[in-house]
Amino acid sequence: MASQYAAELCALLVEDNFGELFARIFSTLTRYDRLNLPRLKFHSGLSNRQLLPALAAMIQQHLVYHYTSYDDGVTYYEANLQSAYYLVRAGKILEFVEERLGKYAATVMSSIMYLGHAQVSHLENLPELQPEQSHTNGVDKEHDEVDGDEEQPNGLSGDHSDQQPALLHPTLKVLAAHGYIIRVREAQFQSHADNILDAERVLKSRPEIKAMKGKRMEEAVIEGTLELLKERTDGDLTRGLMVQGVPRGAKRKHGSKSADAPNKKARVDFASVDEDDEQDEEENEWSDDEMGYDTTPMESGLVVRVNYNKLDVALRNCRFIQIAEQDASPATAEVYECLLRRIEYQTHQCRDTVEIPREGEEGEQYSVPIALSAVAEDVDPRLDLSGSIGPMEISQPDNRRGKRPLEDDVNGTNHEGANGLSSGGNRTFEVDQHLCLLAQPPHNLTSKRIVSGLITWTVEFRHLARKLRHLELERMIEARYGDVALRVVRVLHAKGKLDEKRLQEISLLPFKDLRQVLASMQAGGFVDLQEVPRDAQRQPSRTIYLWYYDPDRICNSVLQDTYKAMSRCFQRLRFERNRLKEFLEKTERSDVKGNEERYLSEGELALLQQWKAKEALLIGEVARLDEMVAVMRDY
């Protein structure tokens, strides 16, 4: 990410959120890379009184890495571009958390995000996290969002100390169980390269490593480095907060089912998915209310921060659901959402490597297998699954004597469940059919696996991440050069390097149109031309010209262009804000805000509407470009 436009964008984000002082230090670190305190003071032109408190605050916001060398004891500082970029994604993250866990959880997440990292005891004293007094003895809407409880206990007193942990600590537990917040570790304040070098230094000093030689020593150091790095940076808080792979207190889509519905799920005979009935019943015994009003406080000295890697996984799943909604029915998309929700709980990050893998060089990475019965449990029982797939006809041949088999309701096992819903076996089969639809080309959103005789479903993450990148590039090429160029690019991507004649034969295009399209795309950097001479003379008449399409180079180029476009949007927004500075200061006054029609003239009201429309347009464009960055870089 360390490029000119990425550094420019991150500096603009830091200035927009934290002010000019932070931006000056951040820009100096991005320009000169890694600096100690005297050099940073010299290049930034700041005094110790300005620099030291600002560095401490930037370290708390995780905008700056710091590392003290073991050789000379000097502390070096380095800009954290990744953490600075996540400032542009803060609104999207808070919107997602509010939709998933409720408004109060989003408020807690916003407070942690604003502080960089925070101690639990400090969060207890924040005014914005205090419960509203109006909900003392009534129904608490925020608490209902987090735990799924419908009412608070009637014995609550109006004491502030009794209310506060009943609301804050369960919310923190739910956020930790989902993986959205993690424990702060010391290694998280150091860059990835510094952590690797430090781990290698520790490993090479061990006697058992010193006794090894050659390739064996290198392999042991690499393996030990990965283990030690994971141990030092692991801040997982989900231990003890998960039940059967699902966070305690997580809301299920069918949490409001009728009281007449059975507490235990019906036995299912489809493909032996419920072979171990006792285990399934034990899993189904816990409910959304198990963690409801669990006032056991979290450790007051625990320091937590936002886990952006986990939130990238959740946002990536949202993109997968959008693809499913384009080509499948709403019921199929909801089934897919239940599968992805289960997978999300057990997926810590989008990919294992920090660097973006090259096309064709990364191995396939499958998600954890999710049992079909678990997906069927999470699907809303009121959802009509049979309406969007073909009718299920199971032929029942007569037995040897030609007698008609007994009806199921004769023995009291009617296939129709409560409220006319199908039985567990039929419904599990229907869920499997919907997942089979998603496994079909061209997207192949799911993959079926048989594990120990049970049907499980997985998602091929790297394949879908590549598919997202290709779809984004194809959409861009079609918008710029038309559908003919899109056809040419698809041929080159499928066949590799081709000369003009062979490309014309496959694409079935006239030479004139083909050459025009290739020339325009080459000028735009989407296709390249390779010259292969037939002899040492290198004459043009004795040279083969091969056209090819390199998605890795194009993705990197598009990523840099996207950084540049986002920077220009922020610069334009700042210019427009400075141009209307006096007017905007007037509209932000406490007496004017909310009473614009009373204190502003008609011309000022029209100007205010124009400014809001322009601001919404630029911020919306930045959000759209951020989606492209996530596809090209993060997913």
Swiss-Prot record:
Zinc as UniProt keyword: yes
Compositionally biased intervals (Basic and acidic residues): 398-407
Pfam families in alphabetical order: HTH_9, POLR3C_WHD, RNA_pol_Rpc82
Location of region: Leucine-zipper: 562-583
A GO CC term assigned to this protein in UniProt: RNA polymerase III complex
One GO BP: DNA-templated transcription
Biased composition (Acidic residues): 272-292
Disordered: region residues: 131-164, 246-295, 386-424
SUPFAM superfamilies (UniProt xref): Winged helix' DNA-binding domain
This protein's record includes keyword tRNA-binding: no
InterPro entries associated with the record: POLR3C_WHD (IPR055207), RNA_pol_III_RPC82-rel_HTH (IPR013197), RNA_pol_III_Rpc82_C (IPR008806), RPC3 (IPR039748), WH-like_DNA-bd_sf (IPR036388), WH_DNA-bd_sf (IPR036390)
Subunit-structure text: Component of the RNA polymerase III (Pol III) complex consisting of 17 subunits.
Role: DNA-dependent RNA polymerase catalyzes the transcription of DNA into RNA using the four ribonucleoside triphosphates as substrates. Specific core component of RNA polymerase III which synthesizes small RNAs, such as 5S rRNA and tRNAs.
Protein's name according to its UniProt entry: DNA-directed RNA polymerase III subunit rpc3
Organism name: Aspergillus clavatus (strain ATCC 1007 / CBS 513.65 / DSM 816 / NCTC 3887 / NRRL 1 / QM 1276 / 107)
